[in-house]
From Swiss-Prot:
This is Chromosome partition protein MukB. The lineage of its organism: Bacteria, Pseudomonadati, Pseudomonadota, Gammaproteobacteria, Enterobacterales. Belongs to the SMC family. MukB subfamily. Homodimerization via its hinge domain. Binds to DNA via its C-terminal region. Interacts, and probably forms a ternary complex, with MukE and MukF via its C-terminal region. The complex formation is stimulated by calcium or magnesium. Interacts with tubulin-related protein FtsZ. NCBIfam families: PRK04863.1 (NF003422). The gene is mukB. Keywords: ATP-binding, Cell cycle, Cell division, Chromosome partition, Coiled coil, Cytoplasm, DNA condensation, DNA-binding, Nucleotide-binding. ATP binds at residues 34-41. It comes from Edwardsiella ictaluri (strain 93-146). It comes from the Bacteria.
């Protein structure tokens, strides 16, 4: 017997109160005794945490922090730990005597959430000498210990030989190891399994009847019938798949038009694009060639235009040069005319100013004389006035000095000194050293006489000087005139130079008068010379344009030749126009014919393709309409033959199907009624008992039992006898054999075996001889052998049937094709080929276009020649009238001579214009130049000497007068003597002052009069001088301008200048007209060239672009053609009728097909992606790839092993037969796979019966369990009434609900749910789907109700409820239920675990004090009988006799809590108290 595994010990490290404590666990009951808070719950919590380290489940409600606000976060674990690393470890020895240490490392996580970090680990192969506390702690200083961290623990364990350390990252792996080693009773694969296990442990820990377990006892006790359920699901999935396949077949059959639509639209989509690219490629080639022709023609035209432009530019340059010369001449003529007009106006101004100057000169001379006399008088009067003023001032000063001297004695001395000074000054001026105050009067009279004499002499000299000035001014004027004309000349040579000038004056006047006649003659000759030059230029241009040399005499012949050439070119242009019109008419006819043939060609091509398809299908050549009708009649006869043969094959196939169905019955029963009877009688079919017989023994046993091989083996015939009377559904012969199906043998018959036969002695008077059958059907091997043969034959018949059906349908399809061909194409199929005629017309149109191109070039050349000839003729028409002028060769010389004469005359005119007035003024005064009045200077010197002498005598007289006036001051020799004299002197001074003031007044009046008169004279003189200077300056400017103009202004000069200007203006206008014409022509030519260059660039760009496109399209087209030919779809895509549609129609056709294809492939991801990729217009090969993908898709949708066709449409039509055959096979398969409602009911009933028997066996183990008034505990398993009704209907009344089970829209689960709802309408199903409800109904557990019942006192069996039981009774009853659950789990998991493993059994019980002694003894007995370990917590008054008891006392030492533990063995066996191994002194880690 396998020994059950046991938990050896529990170790707590660094828990609250337990630093390092190991509890050795008893093999039965371990009791934790102690008061409140002693650590019993902490110990159990450590065990549970090591067993189920899932923080989502752990919740220790009975904690020391009960009622704390953080309890919801703590879950009761954080408060049981101390800071630092903590451990909880279980030491286990399993059935294989393998020691394993499983546990967890716990550590508080810092923070307010009071979280705990848990890491599970396991240690295998640990020797028994090592204790858990030795591994988890390390001794420090002898009496202290330190808790090892998990990495340190790993290092320590791995250092021990043969020991394995495993750390787990998931709880699932941790529990998987514990299950394999037999630590936990069941495999905990998921969180739900862990939750069930924890709920069981929790219910055990807190005791009582757990509602969480009793409400879901089915989940805890009844194992999930996964195999049966999976079989149902697989069968249902097979049925679902079968039905889906059938539905897909029906959809495929119904979507035949859709597939045709897919291939037709794909063909339209791809072929339209294929032919559009083909047309575009051909069009691009034609366009490239056309662009190249246009490019080459444009280049030729550009060269011609450039040559023409160069010629016109050269002519324009010549015209510009001539125009520049003409403009210069015209501007010179205009300037000359303006100069002549300006010179005439200047001459008039000069004459007017000269007259004004002569008048002003005369007036200025008169006024100068008058002003000079007035100036002399004013100066004389001013001197006299100044003298009077001085005298008055002196007298006043003397009188003031005298008055002052009267007051001051010193004044006299001052006056005396002043008198002496005046005397000294008079002596100096008068050169009289002996002058004294006494003789001053005599000298005063003398000097006054000298003053009068000097004044008279001065007046005489002044009169003489004025006369000499007049003579000198005439000589100076004449000398100035001569110097103005000839420049610097000596005064002695002035008379000779003047006479020479006056002698040349008449000749110059005569020469100047010839300017007008010479200018008129010169203008006429210059006009002729200009005309001659213009004619020469025209002649040179004619020579240049005609390309040959010719002189003036050959111009008439050249003009006649040009007129003939113009007529010829005009006639050629008319002929070319008529030819072009004829060619255009022919082109229009060709275009009309091409349009007609293009409209006919698609129908003819389609008819030819249909005819070729018919010929390939029937294998005959159809050359006329009669052959088509004959072939159609032959098809009808072949169809009738194939149809008859197909019906015969179908009958044979049906017979095989029935035989296969009969042999496929389960258990070898050929009649389904036998299975129902066997279930009813509780027996087994004989064929089922011998189902495993070999193929070699099958003939023997078949002959042995003979007709009774379909018998039913029943345990008791007497029990069956009563049921035979009411049998209705049974075979005609029903054999019943009594025997045990589990140990049945063939000893019931007396048998004698013969050669290939047996003799069976049924009775003494009845024997049965049976030969061995050639095809034995007794036993599964024999039936399978026969079925293989039948399957092979059926497949052959099915293949033949499919072939015949295919042939019939093929003939029918061919017949329909013939019918459609006759209705659609027969009228045009045998007409002439329109494409051949189209090719001929295209060739002719190409010839006409080439002829058009050549004719256009020729017409352009003729047009240019005609234009050049007409321009040359216009030049000749202008040149012929000027032939005589071209012959005059002396004209330039005459013009040069006249230009020299005109220049001389103009020089004379300019000289006279500059010096004519001077010579006219010089002529009357030329005589004064003969004598030079040189004495004029001597006279002036005398005048100056007299003037100096007159001033000196005046000063001497004034000085003597002052001495005479101060003569009285000489007597101031002393102050006293001077007082009397001062009175006389004062009177004299006053008298003299009065006379002096009267003289001063008269002098002032005379001075004012002379001053006013002088100012008036000077003002008049200044105005005259200003006017004279202005006139003279203006005259000089006018004369200078006249000299600068350099034009002789005569009467005819203006007329000649105007005529010359008008002639030049006319020539310039003509030249500008020609230049403008040339500029316009050049502009037009440049515009044409620019337009032509743009067209050429565009044409070149278009040509290169088109060539690039053609090249790229060629590469892409090659890829497309390669892809098309490799996949063999060229015949499908190259539809010639589409070649007659334009690009827009083809694009529209492709777009329409694309829209239809998007809808058609919306459900096919692959085709949808390929179609999306094919929409790229730059990748045409992708459309072909899409077409190939459609072909491949359609090929995959058909049976390629049966259908032999490359055409998807034909293959789809051929597939119809195969689909029909598959439909029949799948229908038969569905009938075989169909889940029988009766069989489902039987399976569920059998499973329910088996589980009820298992629960009954579990109840037997609890019959002797008693707690208080509870005498026994049991589980009651009943079938729910609603579900029992469902089972009855499924097994007996299923025919009434065939609408549910035969519906193809409902699965079996859904039909089962609908039936359940129909039978129980009062039950609310909620939001669950029928599929979910049906799957639940396939689970047998949903049919059962489980209750816990107790036999309590006189009440008998009652439902176990906490309210009806005492606390101890409830705890015991709950413990009994948990033991039953653990046993159930072990049995359920036995097949998953090793056969040599018997798992550990351990439960908890907290607060065991509520149990009485008898109940405690019952628990001990239950643990002993079931080999179960139990950990209970009891107060101090509990002292069980068996097991191990730990006394826990929590103490505080040095502010540190620790739990003091004392262990006690059961005293009934050994009444001795022994202390368990005391741990190391608890110290903080």
């Amino acid at each position: 017997m396998i020994e059950r595994g046991k938990f050896r010990s529990l170790t707590l490290v660094n828990w609250n109160g337990f630093f390092a404590r190991t509890f050795d666990l008893d093999e039965l009951v371990t009791t934790l005794s102690g008061g409140n808070g002693a650590g019993k719950s902490t110990t159990m919590a450590a065990f549970v945490t090591a067993l189920i380290p899932d923080l989502t489940l752990l919740h220790f409600r009975n904690t020391t922090e009960a009622g704390a606000t953080s309890g919801s976060r703590d879950k009761g674990l954080h408060g049981k730990l101390r800071p630092g690393v903590c451990y909880a470890a279980l030491d286990v020895v399993n059935s294989r005597h393998q020691r394993v240490l499983v546990g967890v490392r716990l550590q508080q996580v810092a923070g307010r959430d009071r979280k705990v970090d848990i890491k599970p680990f396991a240690i295998q192969g640990l020797p028994t000498a090592y204790q858990p506390t030795q591994l988890l702690t390390e001794t420090v200083d002898g009496r202290q210990a330190r808790v090892l961290a998990l990495p340190e623990l790993k290092e320590r364990v791995e250092a021990i030989d043969g020991v394995q350390f495993k750390q787990f990252n998931s709880i699932t792996d941790y529990h998987a190891l514990m299950f394999d080693l037999g630590v936990v009773p069941r495999r905990l694969r998921s969180a739900a399994d862990r939750s069930k296990f924890y709920r069981l442990i929790e219910a055990s820990l807190y005791g009582g009847i757990s509602s969480a377990i009793t409400r879901s006892l089915r989940d805890y006790l009844l194992p999930e019938n996964g195999g049966v359920r999976k079989a149902f699901q697989d069968m249902e999935a097979a049925l679902r798949e079968n039905r889906m396949t059938l539905e897909a077949i029906r959809v495929t059959q119904s979507d035949r038009d859709l597939f045709k639509h897919l291939i037709s639209e794909a063909t339209a989509y791809v072929s339209a694009d294929y032919m559009r690219h083909a047309n575009e490629r051909r069009s691009h080639l034609d366009q490239a060639l056309q662009l190249r022709r246009e490019l080459l023609g444009g280049r030729r035209q550009l060269l011609s235009e450039q040559y023409r432009h160069v010629e016109m530019a050269r002519e324009l340059e010549e015209q510009n040069g001539a125009e520049a010369d003409l403009e210069t001449d015209y501007q010179a003529a205009s300037d000359h005319l303006n100069l002549v007009q300006t010179a005439l106006r200047q001459r008039e101004k000069i004459e007017r100013y000269q007259g004004d100057l002569e008048e002003l000169s005369y007036r200025l001379d008169e006024q100068s004389e008058v002003a000079a006399e007035a100036q002399e008088q004013y100066e004389s009067c001013q001197e006299r006035s100044e003298a009077a003023e001085a005298e008055v001032d002196e007298l006043k000063s003397q009188l003031a000095d005298y008055q002052q001297a009267l007051d001051v004695q010193q004044t006299r001395a001052i006056q005396y000194q002043q008198a002496l000074q005046a005397l000294a000054r008079a002596q100096t001026l008068c050169t009289l050293p002996a002058l004294s105050a006494d003789d001053v009067e005599s000298w005063l009279e003398d000097f006054r006489a000298r003053e009068e004499e000097a004044t008279e002499l001065l007046l005489q000299l002044e009169q003489k000087l004025s006369v000499a000035n007049a003579a000198h001014s005439q000589f100076e004027e004449a000398y100035r005139l001569v110097a103005r004309v000839v420049g610097e000349v000596s005064r002695s040579d002035a008379w000779q130079a003047g006479r020479a000038l006056l002698r040349e004056w008449p000749a110059l006047q005569h020469q100047a008068q010839r300017v007008a006649p010479i200018g008129a003659r010169l203008a006429e000759l210059e006009q002729r010379l200009n005309a001659q030059q213009d004619a020469e230029r025209l002649l040179q241009e004619c020579v240049k344009r005609s390309g040959r040399d010719c002189d003036a005499q050959q111009l008439d012949a050249l003009q006649a030749e040009l007129e003939a050439q113009i007529d010829t070119l005009t006639q050629q242009a008319a002929d070319a126009g008529e030819r072009s019109m004829a060619l255009r008419q022919e082109l229009e006819q060709i275009a009309g014919r091409v349009g007609t043939l293009s409209a006919r060609a698609p129908a003819w091509i389609a008819a030819q393709e249909a005819l070729n398809a018919l010929e390939s299908q029937c294998g005959e050549t159809l050359e006329e309409s009669r052959a088509v009708t004959d072939q159609m009649q032959q098809l009808l006869e072949r169809e009738r033959e194939y149809t008859v043969e197909r019906d015969e094959i179908a009958a044979r196939k049906g017979a095989l199907e029935r035989e296969i169905e009969r042999l496929s019955q389960p258990g070898g029963a050929e009649d389904a009624r036998l299975i129902a009877l066997a279930e009813r009688f509780g027996g087994v079919l004989l064929s089922e008992i011998y189902d495993d017989v070999t193929l070699d023994d099958a003939p023997y046993f078949s002959a042995l039992y003979g007709p009774s091989r379909h018998a039913i083996v029943v345990p008791d015939l007497a029990a069956v006898r009563a049921q035979l009377a009411g049998l209705e559904e049974c075979p005609e012969d029903l054999y019943l054999i009594e025997g045990d199906p589990q140990s049945f043998d063939d000893s019931v018959f007396a048998v004698e075996e013969l050669e290939k036969a047996v003799v069976v002695k049924i009775a003494d008077r009845q024997w049965r001889y049976s030969r061995f059958p050639s095809l034995p059907l007794f036993g599964r091997a024999a039936r399978e052998s026969r079925l293989e043969t039948l399957y092979t034959e059926r497949e052959a018949l099915a293949e033949r049937y499919a072939t015949l059906s295919f042939d019939v349908q093929k003939i029918q399809r061919l017949h329909h094709a013939f019918s459609r061909f006759i209705g659609s194409h027969l009228a045009v199929v045998f007409d002439n080929d329109p494409e051949q005629e189209l090719r001929q017309l295209q060739q002719r149109r190409g010839e006409i276009e080439r002829e058009f191109t050549g004719q256009d070039a020729q017409t352009q050349q003729q047009r240019q020649q005609l234009q050049q000839a007409r321009e040359l003729a216009g030049l000749l028409n202008r040149l012929v009238p000027q032939v005589g002028l071209l012959a005059d060769e002396t004209l330039p010389d005459r013009v040069d001579e006249l230009r020299e004469e005109l220049e001389q005359a103009r020089d004379a005119a300019r000289y006279l214009q500059q010096h004519g007035a001077t010579l006219a003024a010089l002529e009357p005064v030329i005589g004064v130049l003969q004598s030079d009045p040189q004495q004029h200077e001597q006279l002036q010197q005398d005048y100056q000497q007299a003037l100096q002498r007159q001033r000196l005598t005046k000063q001497q007289a004034f000085a003597l007068t002052e001495v005479a006036q101060r003569r009285a001051h000489f007597s101031y020799s002393d102050a006293v003597g001077m007082l009397g004299e001062n009175a006389d002197l004062n009177e004299r001074l006053r008298q003299r002052l009065e006379h002096a003031e009267a003289d001063r007044s008269r002098s002032r009046e005379q001075l004012r009069q002379h001053q006013a008169q002088l100012a008036q004279y000077n003002q008049v003189l200044a105005s005259l001088k200003s006017a004279f200077d202005a006139k003279r300056d203006m005259l000089q400017e006018l004369q200078q301008e006249m000299q600068d103009i350099g034009v002789v202004a005569d009467a005819s000069a203006e007329a000649r200048a105007r005529t010359r200007r008008d002639e030049l203006h006319a020539a310039l206008s003509e030249n500008r007209s020609r230049r403008n014409q040339l500029e316009k022509q050049i502009t037009i030519c440049e515009a044409e060239m620019e337009s032509l260059i743009k067209r050429l660039r565009k044409a070149e760009r278009d040509y290169h672009l088109m060539r690039t496109q053609v090249t790229q399209a060629k590469a892409g087209w090659c890829a497309v053609m390669r892809l098309v030919r490799d996949n063999g779809v060229e015949r499908r895509l190259h539809r010639r009728e589409l070649a007659y549609m334009d690009a827009d129609e083809l694009r529209s056709m492709s777009d329409k097909a694309l829209g239809a294809l998007r809808l058609a492939v919306a459900d096919n991801e692959h085709l949808r992606d390929v179609l999306r990729l094919s929409e790229d217009p730059k990748r045409p090969e992708r459309k072909v790839q899409f077409y190939v993908a459609v072909y491949q898709h359609l090929r995959e949708r058909i049976r390629q092993d049966i259908i032999r066709s490359d055409d998807p449409i034909d293959a789809i039509e051929q597939m119809e037969i195969e689909l029909a055959r598959l439909t029949e096979e799948l229908t038969a398969r569905e009938q075989k796979l169909a889940i029988s409602a009766r069989s489902v009911a039987n399976i569920i009933r059998k499973t329910i019966q088996r589980e009820q028997n298992r629960i009954r066996m579990l109840n037997q183990g609890l019959q002797s369990v008693a707690f208080g008034q509870v005498n026994s505990v049991r589980l009651n398993v009943n079938v729910r009434d609603s579900h029992a009704m469902l089972l009855n209907v499924l097994s007996e009344q299923q025919e009434q609900h065939q609408d549910l089970f035969n519906s193809n829209r409902l699965t079996f689960s859904e039909a089962l749910a609908k039936l359940y709802q129909r039978l129980n309408p009062q039950i609310d199903m909620g939001q669950r789907t029928p599929q979910t409800i049906g799957e639940e109904l396939l689970d047998y557990r949903s049919y059962l109700e489980m209750e816990v019942e107790v036999n309590r006192g006189s009440d008998g069996w009652l439902r176990a409820e906490s309210g009806a039981l005492s606390t101890g009774e409830a705890i015991g009853t709950g413990m009994s239920i948990l033991v039953m659950v653990v046993q159930s789990w072990e049995e359920e998991s036995r097949r998953l675990r090793g056969k040599d493993i018997s798992p550990c059994r351990l439960l908890f019980l907290d607060e065991a004090a509520r149990l009485d002694a008898k109940s405690i003894a019952t628990l001990f007995e239950l643990c002993e009988r079931l080999e179960m370990q139990l950990i209970i917590a009891a107060p101090e008054n509990i002292s069980p006799e068996k097991g191990t008891t730990y006394k826990l006392v929590r103490k505080v030492f040095n502010h540190i809590e620790h739990v003091h533990v004392v262990g006690l063995r059961g005293f009934s066996a050994a009444a001795e108290e022994e202390h368990m191994a005391q741990p190391l002194e608890d110290t903080p880690a």
